[in-house]
Amino acid sequence: MSGQQKTSELVFFVNGKKVTDTNPDPECTLLTYLRDKLRLCGTKLGCAEGGCGACTVVISRMDRGQNKIRHLAVNACLTPVCAMHGCAVTTVEGIGSTRTRLHPVQERLAKAHGSQCGFCTPGIVMSMYALLRSAEQPSMRDLEVAFQGNLCRCTGYRPILEGYKTFTKEFACGMGDKCCKVNGKGCGGGDDTQSVTDDTLFERSQFQPLDPSQEPIFPPELQLTPTYDSESLIFSSERVTWYRPTTLQELLQLKSDHPSAKLVVGNTEVGVEVKFKHFLYPHLINPTQVPELLEVRESEESIYFGAAVSLMEIDALLRQRIEELPEAQTRLFQCAVDMLHYFAGKQIRNVACLGGNIMTGSPISDMNPVLTAAGARLEVASLVGGKTSHRTVHMGTGFFTGYRRNVIEPHEVLLGIHFQKTTPDQHVVAFKQARRRDDDIAIVNAAVNVRFEPRTNVVAGISMAFGGMAPTTVLAPRTSQLMVKQPLDHHLVERVAESLCGELPLAASAPGGMIAYRRALVVSLIFKAYLSISRKLSEAGIISTDAIPAEERSGAELFHTPVLRSAQLFERVCSEQPVCDPIGRPEVHAAALKQATGEAIYTDDIPRMDGELYLGLVLSTKPRAKITKLDASEALALEGVHAFFSHKDLTEHENEVGPVFHDEHVFAAAEVHCYGQIVGAVAADNKALAQRAARLVRVEYEELAPVIVTIEQAIEHGSYFPDYPRYVNKGNVEEAFAAAEHTYEGSCRMGGQEHFYLETHAAVAVPRDSDELELFCSTQHPSEVQKLVAHVTTLPAHRVVCRAKRLGGGFGGKESRGISVALPVALAAYRLRRPVRCMLDRDEDMLITGTRHPFLFKYKVAFASDGLITACDIECYNNAGWSMDLSFSVLERAMYHFENCYRIPNVRVGGWVCKTNLPSNTAFRGFGGPQGMFAGEHIIRDVARIVGRDVLDVMRLNFYKTGDITHYNQKLEHFPIERCLDDCLAQSRYHEKRTEIAKFNRENRWRKRGMAVIPTKYGIAFGVMHLNQAGALINVYGDGSVLLSHGGVEIGQGLNTKMIQCAARALGIPIELIHISETATDKVPNTSPTAASVGSDLNGMAVLDACEKLNKRLAPIKEALPQGTWQEWINKAYFDRVSLSATGFYAMPGIGYHPETNPNARTYSYYTNGVGISVVEIDCLTGDHQVLSTDIVMDIGSSINPAIDIGQIEGAFMQGYGLFTLEELMYSPQGMLYSRGPGMYKLPGFADIPGEFNVSLLTGAPNPRAVYSSKAVGEPPLFIGSSAFFAIKEAIAAARQEQGLTGDFPLEAPSTSARIRMACQDKFTNLLEIPEEGSFTPWNIVP
């Protein structure tokens, strides 16, 4: 076969339609094929590494061995299109649409308010669809597993689960056979999941029933044509050849001819290497039709799995055998199943195979430690002298010979793996610790295979294997030998721990970092294994039940995702409110149905235009250096490459840009200031070519020093932006300190946060006639893009139009940083007179665009013996990166919010904007507020600890009261924080839980719980006065339909939905008559960014202004036709020549405070307040944690749309939870970002939401300063996520107290598993020798 030259024909089906390709590209993914060739853009590119699930599609294939059709959710971003031969692909467009019929999975997600920005929605829909095609009535556990590979950055996951649990077995109805789900009338049924959800947020009775008989049939041609599976295939392109052999002989011959060829089954490793490491494999072999690699057979001693059998198939069969066979025989099976549950996401497990896992040899593989400890037997084959040769290899000592290398020769093929059945005296256990439990790579994992002397706890033999401690999976033979013939008890385990510390060292600079934590995990996981095995020995009566102290037994347990319980409480509209008046009603997001069907168009979904080019960016590979050479000749020599752009194509003035200060460059000029700075751009025919050409551009540097990365380094070098520090003062701090009963000095620190909007930055620029330039841009600030494009091209602004229909998330990251992509794209389009497009890959986006600002706070506080705070002197430092961007405003908000809800009569706040060699950090939801309040909550807890009072009491003592004045001279009006607190305490059963937590902590040594209360006060307004304005335009057409335009951008926050609701009430018409098309600078000029949570406040009032103008014009007509309809009034107005178009404008009154020029004005229009209470449990041995419950009460005035507002609260909480506990940016000491995708950067997933999640909107609290008495909601709830952080800190304190450690201890945010574990000092951490800081160069640092 390897000598075959003819390229085969690729045949597969997509949404029921046959696709035939005579020249497929082996380098092309299914996602690229769907989007670029078939124009099916519902499937999204979110990460390109199989970590976010936005690209999920369903692959259906005929299993001829079992004569059944299998439906699998897969990641289209990793799936090679050549692997689709003989398959049927279903995308989100193929299951339903708004124009024909919605599928129930689309409808329920949308109507349950489970779609906000909508970019992740098609992937989540298809994960659910795949589950229902495999199990018509799944369980809640099935639901949990189905979504392990999907991420959502907006919703907080709760509404998605609430909508989809209506498909599950647990969603039961007491009507039995009379249930409306059975008789096809939809469901308003019951719920066995104990959810107390107020189901008025959505009407379950409106859901259409699921009818499996209506699903698309599997293409008969594929079902009836076995040659699709039996024929050998070869697909060739200029660089790569793809082979699909169908016999073992063919496979071995190919491997003999091409020993370096890669075998590709799921492409989950090779795909990532090709995409991000730019590896080129000229020969790829797909062995999925070779029977010997798909074989499954069972004997008395083992189960044999072919090397290409998928992990999900292995999991299913092992689970079946666990149910059928005696427990003593299935301990290895159970261990494997436990590890597989946390192995990637379901989309990966559906296609990945165990053979690939073994042969890849990752040092942090989840399965290799299990197989190594078990000494798994492998079957290997090769061609020797033209004949097939077989041999057996054992995984164990010597199997792995180096990083990603093993004893299997390049020309050999792994055929399969034997899973041994265990004996009654054998126990196998394994543990994995990662940053996040679901879909994450291990930090350290461990597997133990131990045999005991019959009916004793005396070790007869033991094998311990570890991942994450060396370049390969490693064994601990010396420690294992020490254990032989010894009883497994506490004494032995202590000796084992000490021995392992010596046997498994780790260099202080080892890749991956977290050195002390990883070493601690080795002994901690072995201790968990000891507890787990001892419990089983105790249950078998082999050792005494008292052998393990009762308080230690829970140390063996793992966290499991509980079934969600939730409540959403809000004020219902009064019965007298007209039905057509939507204000206060939980209307569905205006675009939700389009998003759920894949019909919603985002920037990169815009159809390709004739002559369109793609722009590939050339990025700096140095943190600080002079550019000595820039040579694009090699790139320009490629066919299909049309131009290269750099600073040489602009004047110095044109190249200087920035949102406020023009201290940035479109293209780096003489110097680069950070990794990832844009040096140039290549315009080519397509994305792959443009990116390949960009990598060929030669940039030579002369490196400069010093390179400043961290805040501490900036302080050391005095590296601050001009005009800093700045101070805000109130009262007399020095006098207050002199008179104080107590003073305390402390500090706290928190890291940055990646926005991780699911849609990366994107722009399309189209030159028009008359020197016009039209941009479609994923930006929160179209007018800023318009202004800077005009600046760069030297066009007047009226020749540049910027459009933003919708964004796939923003969170502040698209407020100013959109120019990074938009300006090079616009320049290229303008100069080449051709349409140009660019959408950043995830790694590019994370490298280029900056993050939330890391902060360091140093404070001194004065207080009385009862805890009343009298003064605070605080220094605030933020890490701005290399340019100013909006860092000055972020710092100012932090300085204005540090006191949170607490009155401090004497204040001195100093602020420093640190200049470092990082990409410029930027706006992020909260905009410095959460960082400032983080310091305030440390201060209040420090005070409570020192005076020995309960934190809650000290909070109440120091709370602001209505009428108090802040340190920036703003009087607090309508300040309901005590009411929010009281409601939240009652809702959460705070005092009852306090008692329960104390009891739990007494009874458990290695598990601890904590509880924290977090209040929040968030000021609403832009920090600069001129941005607090908005405009609107309303056009009414002859048929009565209304086209509404406003200056805000729909980012997923429901702004368009709310604006439609506002206009509907103002005009007295149904929402169905109103449509918003897009945000565009030619409709509403000079817009402010959609940011600062004021989108509804500003644009809503502008919309009302426009509506009032229309109403005044229509008033005489309505008086003349009092019984007329809206359409009749509009028709009459048209014929009476009354203008049916109106503009609206609003400028927020009473703001613009400046201590010298405008001292009587407000800084903020008003405040949004709330209180959150979280209960958290930690595993002291691993640092893992779980949020058991969260209760939130928010004062958001009179809600315009409670479903959207509650969704914003839940989403903000989860984003804040990620900020404070989970999301860690990893940088090299030179400032290179390691965490450039979901593989290393972990945001919360479905399994991370609180087990009980209750949100209540404060009733009877209208706000006179915003549209329809509402309040801003986007940013204020985010800081409540810190309740998990402070609950974790309380739990750690409980663990430390048992060790006699009663003082304060540092804990940086995020409180990752590493920081939690190392703060829980105990006998295991005390075994470690920690090298002195400064004695080595760490692998990573915190900026």
Curated annotation (Swiss-Prot):
Residues that hold Mo-molybdopterin according to the record: 780, 811, 925, 1092
Gene that this polypeptide is encoded by: ry
Family, as annotated: Belongs to the xanthine dehydrogenase family.
Domain 2Fe-2S ferredoxin-type stretches: 8-95
Family matches, as SMART domains: Ald_Xan_dh_C (SM01008), CO_deh_flav_C (SM01092)
EC number: 1.17.1.4
Principal EC category: oxidoreductase
Residue sites binding substrate per the record: 815, 893, 927
Primary role: Key enzyme in purine degradation. Catalyzes the oxidation of hypoxanthine to xanthine. Catalyzes the oxidation of xanthine to uric acid.
UniProt-listed SUPFAM superfamilies: 2Fe-2S ferredoxin-like, CO dehydrogenase flavoprotein C-terminal domain-like, CO dehydrogenase ISP C-domain like, CO dehydrogenase molybdoprotein N-domain-like, FAD-binding/transporter-associated domain-like, Molybdenum cofactor-binding domain
Active site (record annotation): 1275
NCBIfam families: xanthine_xdhA
List of residues binding [2Fe-2S] cluster 1: 47, 52, 55, 77
Quaternary data: Homodimer.
Protein name: Xanthine dehydrogenase
Reported cofactor(s): FAD; Mo-molybdopterin; [2Fe-2S] cluster
Gene Ontology BP terms: xanthine catabolic process
GO CC annotations, alphabetized: peroxisome
Superkingdom of this protein's organism: Eukaryota
List of residues binding [2Fe-2S] cluster 2: 117, 120, 152, 154
Natural source organism: Drosophila pseudoobscura pseudoobscura (Fruit fly)
PROSITE patterns attached to this UniProt entry: 2FE2S_FER_1, 2FE2S_FER_2, FAD_PCMH, MOLYBDOPTERIN_EUK
Keyword Transcription: no
Residue ranges occupied by any FAD-binding PCMH-type domain in the UniProt entry: 235-424
Localization terms from the record: Peroxisome
UniProt KW Repeat keyword: no
Catalytic reaction(s) noted: xanthine + NAD(+) + H2O = urate + NADH + H(+); hypoxanthine + NAD(+) + H2O = xanthine + NADH + H(+)
